[in-house]
Amino acid sequence: MEYGLDLEYSFNEFLKGFGLSSEIAHIIWLPLPMLLVLVAAVVGVLVTVWLERKISAAAQQRIGPEYAGALGVLQPIADGLKLLVKEDIIPAKADGILFTAGPILVLVPVILSWLIVPFGQNLLISNVGIGIFLWIALSSIQPIGLLMSGYASNNKYSLLGGLRAAAQSISYEIPLALSVLAIVLMTNSLSTIDIVNQQSGAGILSWNIWRQPVGFIVFWICALAECERLPFDLPEAEEELVAGYQTEYAGMKFALFYLGSYINLILSALLVSILYLGGWGFPVPVELIAKFLNLPINAPFLQVFTASIGIVMTVLKAYLLVFIAILLRWTTPRVRIDQLLDLGWKFLLPISLANLLITAGLKLAFPQFFGG
């Protein structure tokens, strides 16, 4: 059974109340999804940057930012304004077109991937039936932008960083996709909505993390590598490559890389929440909540309540994972490039492939637990 609100339907019905036709209401709705995505992504980045600076300060027994607003909450905005007013420099011997296109090609696919993220039942920007396939396809574009940025800079450190970034992204893209395929196999759907609904039967006990513990670990490791977070930040290792493919960038072009990295981290955490932790699902079944409140399951108040708390649950699970990623960055050493590639090709790839085959076998043997 479906609970919650349909964002597009509710908006169109609201406009119809003012006498507008269905066609005009739909036209007004069309540009809003991308605007909502941009606002959600930017706000998420501001919160995550502030959290990272505060958590890293606590890990190193420092205070962290505290002067830009209360507890330094305005520090990310100050950083953004600083980068906005800095001079935009293109090196004399760089390829200007590729140099400019690189950061855009890195950022745009990550933002578009947010279109398939559901924050609640029917509360998503675009209900694409092949949402998982779309996300995997969009994420495969990013290595092209990274390699393009490194090559166009005409700098040896940038080129090495770009090559490392492309190799790392390709190496971890395959086990990541295989771990997601195991979820798709159990759900019989590529829709993120269907994947969450499949985990809503018995509260926390029906979450995919219990049926796919290996897939969960593989996905999270690969997601951190895709986001180039420590211990997988080889493409921009300061001690070796200055700043990797970002070395020659300044101002807003550098900010686009910075923005893309954090948006990708939040997106990865949201996808882990959706695929393995029940998404907007409660730890207890909604039927028990309705019984406790003595309300029918389709009561309007209960629908609004579950939709609102569902958003909080999705974001809370995602930021718990972001917190873990930040702690890992400031408490683990960087691996070598050969160790990085060995982990991806010699360990995670065979493990994710074996996990997919075992899931297929378990689905045939126990269809009631692993999808029919």
From Swiss-Prot:
Its main location: membrane. It is an enzyme of class 7 (translocase). Keywords: Membrane, NAD, NADP, Plastoquinone, Quinone, Thylakoid, Translocase, Transmembrane, Transmembrane helix. It is found in: Cellular thylakoid membrane. One of its GO terms (molecular function) is oxidoreductase activity, acting on NAD(P)H, quinone or similar compound as acceptor. The chain crosses the membrane at residues 27-47, 97-117, 128-148, 176-196, 204-224, 266-286, 308-328, 347-367. It comes from the Bacteria. One of its GO terms (biological process) is aerobic respiration. Its EC number is 7.1.1.-. The keyword Amino-acid biosynthesis does not apply. It holds the Pfam family NADHdh. It is a multi-pass membrane protein. Belongs to the complex I subunit 1 family. NDH-1 shuttles electrons from an unknown electron donor, via FMN and iron-sulfur (Fe-S) centers, to quinones in the respiratory and/or the photosynthetic chain. The immediate electron acceptor for the enzyme in this species is believed to be plastoquinone. Couples the redox reaction to proton translocation, and thus conserves the redox energy in a proton gradient. NDH-1 is composed of at least 11 different subunits. This is NAD(P)H-quinone oxidoreductase subunit 1. It comes from Prochlorococcus marinus (strain AS9601). The lineage of its organism: Bacteria, Bacillati, Cyanobacteriota, Cyanophyceae, Synechococcales.
